[in-house]
């Protein structure tokens, strides 16, 4: 059975739908929420899991608590192992710690949902030691994700 790490940046892409250029920083995030922004990356993660259908049953998923992954699995009805991590409001360091944890536990691949910042955080944490698949979920994607 393949072991897949699954990381969601819960605030990636929120600013786009409300005319902002991202959600970098607490002030901009707060403004996006007030303007009615929704969690784009979480929705994409859930859609990804649902699209796998019965194939998801053949994969051992490892994910982060709450909005960094667990919530998508609960919504999609897919089983997963929740790794140690912060619940509630998270930051880039939580993403880095999760990626390192997945690398240390020899997962086959990390799939992440986020933008350029999330891509950089994961690359900084795992270098090229594990395959990484990015599902673009940011507002202003500039990287090759």
Protein language model annotation of sequence segments:
Residues 109, 113, 122-145:
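Short, acidic/small-residue loops that bind anionic groups at enzyme active sites
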Residues 65, 113-116:
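Glycine-rich beta-strand-to-loop/alpha-helix junction loops that act as flexible
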Residues 16-17, 73, 121-123, 144:
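Short glycine-/acidic-enriched loop or helix-start segments at secondary-structure transitions
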Residues 100-103, 120-124:
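A broadly conserved amphipathic alpha-helix scaffold signal in soluble, globular proteins
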Residues 10-11, 116-117, 138:
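Short glycine-rich anion-binding loops that position phosphate/pyrophosphate groups of nucleotides
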Residues 1-108:
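ATP/NTP phosphate-donor binding region
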